Amino acid sequence: MKTATRKADSARASAAKKRAAPKAAAKKPARMYRTNLRDVPKVGGLKRRDGWVDMQVQFLIDKKSAGADHVVGWTVLKPGARHENHRHHNCDEFFIVLKGKGHIYTENGEQPSSEGDVVYSPRTCWHGFNNTSNEDVVLVWGWMGAGSIEASGYEVDPATH
């Protein structure tokens, strides 16, 4: 009788193990990513028809370089350069004006912007920047929730073209 009970207990224990949720696969350890502006190539192929007018853009951190699900970028806008009104369907954007001044495009028209301004634009909100000064404008910016321009859902405002 004891043998039959042991066999039944063993069978129940074996079935319970099979029903138990499998252990989560071990995640790769996180790795820090570091780069330098001098080492990151400028983005080529940015087209005026897509709202990129005379801009120097670098993707410092993104999916391709760091496996990130966001982008951190650096942009220099020469006098007269602008990033036309645009929006992102799949991510939020922020930018910080490190140097220079110009105008921010908003859903309510243009507003002046200068060194030290920090701007946040939630997904689908139209925004842009125009360098109206005689000096370079330098921006640090980021897309939160998309690791590439393709993933961001970028759309230029057809009304500006």
Describe each model-derived feature in a short phrase.
Residues 90-92, 96-102:
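Glycine- and acidic-residue-biased ligand/ion/polar-headgroup-sensing regions
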Residues 74-75, 120, 135-152:
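A short hydrophobic beta-strand segment most commonly corresponding to one strand
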Residues 84-86, 104-105, 121, 127-133:
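Short beta-strand His + acidic residue motifs that chelate non-heme Fe in jelly-roll/DSBH
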Residues 73-88:
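Conserved short histidine dyad/triad with adjacent acidic residue
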Residues 2-69, 84, 153-161:
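A short, N-terminal "cap"/entry segment at the start of jelly-roll beta-barrel domains
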Residues 90, 109, 125-126, 135, ...:
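A generic "binding-loop/recognition-motif" signal
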